[in-house]
Design a protein with these regions (language model features):
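Membrane-integrated ABC transporters
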Residues: 168-181
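FAD-binding core of flavoproteins
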Residues: 9-166
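A cross-family signal for key residues in well-ordered alpha-helices
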Residues: 2, 72, 181
Length: 181
């Protein structure tokens, strides 16, 4: 959002995240696509001022739930890979979104095991305002690449520092609020 969002999207989405008022989940992985992010099949089809999202994502989040979801979806089914994807930030409570827990074995303390909860998230004709589209239709590969670069640290320190500097400049008006709370 910081890099690819419009100013209106930054104003709507970022302050509540900075203030810790909302919990977010990223939804990338799909059954059958695994780590092939360009192979997602969850569809987001434009219908007037909305997108209708249908599909599912797996290995999502934790048992704490989410208020907002950022996700990649296919907005041009059958289109060229990497040129048919779009990035969205949407309200997790929209009608048609169902979260189903997946109990998985994870690593616990002292090398033991603990159950680790992830979720499957289903989208059944979820209507999302076009405002939720980040970075432009069919430009999701760029947004996802930027997101993963920041998350995983690929692309080198210079790129991360530049984005971090932008983040700090953007958050500066909220520092007092952040420090008080």
């Amino acid at each position: 959002i910081l890099v690819w969002g419009t100013e209106a999207q930054k104003q709507a989405f970022l302050p509540p995240i900075y203030r810790g008022e909302v919990r977010t989940w990223q939804l990338l992985t799909e059954p059958g696509a695994g780590s092939d992010l360009a192979g997602v099949t969850t569809a987001a089809i434009r219908d007037g001022d909305e997108y209708v999202i249908t599909g599912q994502k797996i290995f999502v989040g934790s048992d704490h739930g989410a208020d907002r979801i950022w996700m990649i979806a296919c907005t041009k089914p059958g289109g060229p890979r990497h040129e048919n994807l779009s990035w969205f930030m949407l309200d997790a409570s929209l009608p048609g979104i169902t979260v189903q827990p997946m109990e998985l074995m994870g690593t616990g303390g002292e090398g033991g095991t603990d159950p680790v909860q992830k979720n499957t998230v289903f989208f059944d004709q979820v209507r999302v305002p076009a405002f939720a589209l980040i970075g432009g239709e069919n430009q999701g590969w760029k947004a996802a690449s930027t997101h993963l670069e920041l998350e995983h640290g690929a692309g080198g320190r210079i790129g991360r520092n530049r984005v971090w500097d932008r983040l700090l400049r953007y958050a500066e008006p909220y520092w007092e609020v952040l420090l008080i709370h």
